[in-house]
Amino acid sequence: MATSTSPIKLAVLDDYQGIAAPHFEKLKPTFEITIFRDTLLPYNNPATPESVKEELVERLKPFTVISTIRERTPFPGALLEKLPNLKLLQSTGERNLAFDTVAAKKLGILMSGAATLSPTDSAAKKRGPDSTTQHCIALILGIARNLAHDDLAVKNGGWETLLATGLSGKTFGTLGLGRLGFNVAKILHTVFGMKIIAWSSSLTQEAADEKAKAGGLPVLDDDGDKTFKVVSKEELFSTADIVSLHYVLSDRSRGMVGKKDLALMKPSAFFINTSRGPLVIERDLLDVLKAGKIRGAALDVFDLEPLPKDSEWRTYKWGTDGRSHVLLSPHMGFVEEEVMHHWYDETVENVLRWHEGKEVLHSLY
């Protein structure tokens, strides 16, 4: 709770779309609002220069309250220790694995989140798939149907140049069958007629069958095969036409996909990642795609975000000279207009609750 009579310094980070300002107006004049639309490189990434780390500390040091968007700006303990004025760190979503909650608690920094949908929203239960599921499906269709390539070709005076890859009857392999993996698999099975195979380190066939039933799907498909067939990791990579990653990033899962796995993929297969970049050994994936060993990849997440201007993902001419096709988006899986505005509304509510000495919503520890 704040006690100073002078304006409390509040920073809004990572406002890429420039939509935050109207939401925070109601906090004035009690709070002095500073909005940053850019994101500096992560403090805890080995590739981040010391000069950038120092710049980040100097940028954040004056603020008592900081509002962030998901994991765009990580807050490891080493950074938190250099921010003596920080009392409230507000994230969006209901968890943030880029926050060091242990260090924050030790330092007396309150951390809170914002729910994706309002609990009083009567339409919430009627909604279709979440934004990340929709984005994953869009990437799969985009890379399989060559949408970005064809759009550019037509705008530059060209016409038909490539053949699309149909999904019907093909095999979708999901690494992870949690909420997102299940949602994507269900759509591809029911709408596009794809066969589904799944793997995770703890997934059993019994559990996959229960997920199918709970999701309103039969345990067996029309051919008598399991709707969600659990296979080994090796079988998934070697037989799937689309391999899609749906895993939570942890010390255990970091780098879980590497050259040994990617080498098993069929030349006609696609690799999709809408989860987290560090789940994949990025250099191994780059090497496979540069050599054109698979048909292509569609990625929404990367090791280092935002991507540096000189990143090979940006600079290579993908889809030419034997290279695989690559479709990229800038970590947009959760970025929907309604969701973002709701997050800012709830962030402001939490700041007010903190200032008034009330319990904040969605404490992160």
What is each stretch, according to the model?
Residues 1-65, 69-70, 205, 213:
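N-terminal glycine-/charge-rich "phosphate-binding" loop or analogous flexible N-terminal tail
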Residues 61-155, 165:
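Phosphate/diphosphate ligand-binding glycine-rich loop within oxidoreductases
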Residues 68-69, 92, 239, 245-249, ...:
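Short, well-ordered coil/turn residues at beta-beta hairpins
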Residues 130-152, 182, 186-194, 346-356:
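Oxidoreductase and adenylate-handling cofactor-binding alpha/beta cores
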Residues 268-365:
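Rossmann-like dinucleotide-binding domain for NAD(H)/NADP(H)
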